[in-house]
């Protein structure tokens, strides 16, 4: 029992109603959140002499204070518990690391509907199909749909400003509804209906309608039309032949679990209309001593009861582990969805086959993850030995990217004991410096990153500075001047200079800006982890710089031409079919645009050419 917490006095004040409790340590940090049907009974169990696990013993030893929130029902307690877990991220709770909303395919409600990927709240008028496991699955499906059913995927701003068709029309990936006369309203509406049926899992209806149209076209001697429809039929069949489809045609999520060496993998199959849309593996953060039942129960609750997950509920959830609160979970999900949600643990037939697939995928993903973690752990241990540190729990690396001093972007990437922590990667737009001054850029990003209060768990053990002695000197100067509440001497600053011809394995490392550096053998695990984080930082910086450069390039060209305001820009883009069409136009063609004189056309022409 905690020596700094009077459990007896506290328990006298606790009610026997349902609710949620939050446990705090001496620093005022929430270390655990839990729910209970009977708060008094549940909280009393923490302060018995014979505790169930070492994890609970370690938790209780750190309790300084407990807050209790009483709720009307168990369902309210369950929802509030997961909201608090998401808010506080307590270290003794099982935590779902990835809380992104899932993407959908969106079919807009416009006169000429468009297909697009959508995340977040569903405010726009139209139909939503999904969810898909990730953005890649959506983009792959959109590319496939574009080949089979050529309806538009362009933004409305582009669609409304076209006077001639784009490249997608030329290569047969769009029917060109933006230009009058290219496609009839009936034909476009028919293709949209095919997409709607296809995404709803009604492939047979699509094929039946296409075959009927092909036969009619043949009877009418419209052989080119019949051949085009035949190609559509073949494309649809090729897609459906590759897909295992359940005869039931239901919407369900299938959750398989694997647990080994203190690490858990939860694999989710997303099945809609009987089709597997995709799958995804999750590796929740599991405190030591946690039982598998708690991992599954907490994961399922967080997965469906936090934020956007509530809008993607299927009709049925299959689990390969029996939950103690299965009925409570099903009732809570049903209440949220406004319809009955079933939670099953012993399926048969196709459902059993799906569950076996999810379980196998979870086991395979866990084996791969453990292997990767073993490699990362070995590398971090080797680097800690080289740097004479007891351990490395967190590393951060910085890099600068620009083109001739323009659009400068700094990147910060983060590694923890499991490798890249991509959710904490950051980019910083650098401004107010002399173009091309990498030292000033590094100085600015380090001040912005570290010149403020930082949680103790997020103070890095090692900070890598990509660039060698000069950049390391800037980092040392920044840290010498910092006035912060955390120990600014704790992070070890390490400069990394690229080798001759930037060849991997020839890097030189520096502890101090003055004096000689040192190198590690090319086969050193310590060097490999340095190369890994350095390359991640480099790629992250370049990616941000390219996006910034592309944005400037695409928006500033016309804006810099004197005499071309917003209305003339819009008119030019509309009549020329976009910026590329305008670049390819002659002076005479530009002069034909309403409101553009011969002199202004020449100015526009030469500005775009040079």
Curated annotation (Swiss-Prot):
Pfam families: GIY-YIG, HHH_5, UVR, UvrC_RNaseH, UvrC_RNaseH_dom. Gene3D superfamilies: 5' to 3' exonuclease, C-terminal subdomain, GIY-YIG endonuclease, UVR domain, UvrC, RNAse H endonuclease domain. One of its GO terms (biological process) is SOS response. InterPro entries: GIY-YIG_endonuc, GIY-YIG_endonuc_sf, GIY-YIG_UvrC_Cho, Hlx-hairpin-Hlx_DNA-bd_motif, RuvA_2-like, UVR_dom, UVR_dom_sf, UvrABC_protein_C. GO terms for molecular function: DNA binding; excinuclease ABC activity. GO terms for cellular component: cytoplasm; excinuclease repair complex. Residues 204-239 form the UVR domain. Keywords: Cytoplasm, DNA damage, DNA excision, DNA repair, Excision nuclease, SOS response. SUPFAM superfamilies: C-terminal UvrC-binding domain of UvrB, GIY-YIG endonuclease, RuvA domain 2-like. It is found in: Cytoplasm. Interacts with UvrB in an incision complex. HAMAP family: UvrC (MF_00203). The UvrABC repair system catalyzes the recognition and processing of DNA lesions. UvrC both incises the 5' and 3' sides of the lesion. The N-terminal half is responsible for the 3' incision and the C-terminal half is responsible for the 5' incision. This is UvrABC system protein C. The lineage of its organism: Bacteria, Pseudomonadati, Pseudomonadota, Gammaproteobacteria, Enterobacterales. The gene is uvrC.
């Amino acid at each position: 029992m905690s020596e700094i917490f009077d459990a007896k006095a506290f328990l006298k004040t606790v009610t026997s109603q349902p609710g949620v409790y939050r446990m705090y340590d001496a620093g005022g940090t929430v270390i655990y959140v839990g729910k209970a049907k009977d708060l008094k009974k549940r909280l009393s169990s923490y302060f018995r002499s014979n505790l169930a696990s070492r994890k609970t013993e370690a938790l209780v030893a750190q309790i300084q204070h407990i807050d209790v929130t009483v709720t009307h029902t168990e369902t309210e307690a369950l929802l509030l518990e997961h909201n608090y877990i998401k808010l506080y991220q307590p270290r003794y709770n099982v935590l779902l690391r990835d809380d992104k909303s899932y993407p959908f395919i969106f079919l807009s409600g416009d006169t000429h509907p468009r297909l697009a990927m959508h995340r977040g709240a569903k405010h726009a008028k139209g139909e939503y199909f999904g969810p898909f496991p990730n953005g890649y699955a959506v983009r792959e499906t959109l590319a496939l749909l574009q080949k089979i059913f050529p309806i538009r995927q362009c933004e409305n701003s582009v669609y409304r400003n076209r006077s001639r068709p784009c490249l997608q029309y030329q290569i047969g990936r769009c029917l060109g509804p933006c230009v009058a006369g290219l496609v009839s309203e009936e034909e476009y509406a028919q293709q949209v209906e095919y997409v709607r049926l296809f995404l709803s899992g009604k492939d047979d209806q699509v094929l039946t309608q296409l075959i009927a149209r092909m036969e009619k076209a043949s009877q009418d001697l419209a052989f080119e039309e019949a051949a085009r429809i035949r190609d559509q039929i073949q494309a649809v069949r090729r897609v459906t032949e590759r897909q295992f489809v359940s005869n039931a045609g239901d919407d369900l999520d299938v959750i398989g679990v694997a647990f080994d060496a203190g690490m858990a993998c939860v694999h989710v199959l997303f099945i809609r209309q009987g089709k597997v849309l995709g799958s995804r593996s999750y590796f929740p953060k599991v405190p030591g001593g946690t039982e598998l039942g708690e991992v599954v129960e907490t994961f399922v609750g967080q997965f469906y009861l936090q934020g956007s997950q509530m809008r993607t509920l299927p009709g049925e959830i299959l689990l390969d582990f029996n939950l103690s609160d299965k009925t409570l979970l099903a009732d809570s999900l049903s209440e949220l969805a406004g319809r009955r949600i079933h939670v099953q643990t012993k399926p048969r037939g196709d459902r059993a086959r799906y569950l076996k697939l999810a379980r196998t995928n979870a086991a395979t993903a866990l084996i791969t993850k453990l292997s990767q973690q073993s490699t990362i752990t070995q590398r971090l241990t080797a680097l800690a030995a080289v740097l004479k540190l007891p351990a490395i729990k967190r590393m951060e690396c910085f890099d600068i990217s620009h083109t001739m001093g323009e659009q400068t972007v700094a990147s910060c990437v983060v590694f923890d004991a499991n490798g890249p922590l991509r959710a904490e990667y950051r980019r910083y737009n650098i401004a107010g410096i002399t173009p091309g001054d990498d030292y000033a850029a590094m100085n600015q990003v380090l001040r912005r990153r570290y010149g403020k209060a930082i949680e103790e768990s997020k103070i890095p053990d090692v900070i890598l500075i990509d660039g060698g002695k000069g950049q390391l000197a800037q980092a040392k100067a920044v840290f010498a001047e910092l006035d912060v509440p955390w120990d600014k001497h704790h992070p070890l600053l390490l400069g990394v200079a690229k080798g001759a011809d930037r060849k991997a394995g020839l890097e030189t490392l520096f502890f101090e800006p003055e004096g000689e550096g040192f190198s590690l053998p090319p086969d050193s695990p310590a060097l490999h982890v340095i190369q890994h984080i350095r390359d991640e930082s480099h790629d992250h910086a370049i990616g941000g710089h390219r996006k910034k450069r592309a944005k400037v390039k695409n928006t500033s060209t016309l804006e810099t031409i004197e005499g071309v305001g917003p209305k003339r820009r819009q008119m030019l883009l509309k009549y020329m079919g976009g910026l590329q069409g305008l670049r390819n136009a002659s002076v005479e063609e530009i002069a034909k645009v309403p409101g553009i004189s011969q002199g202004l056309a020449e100015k526009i022409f030469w500005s775009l050419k040079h």
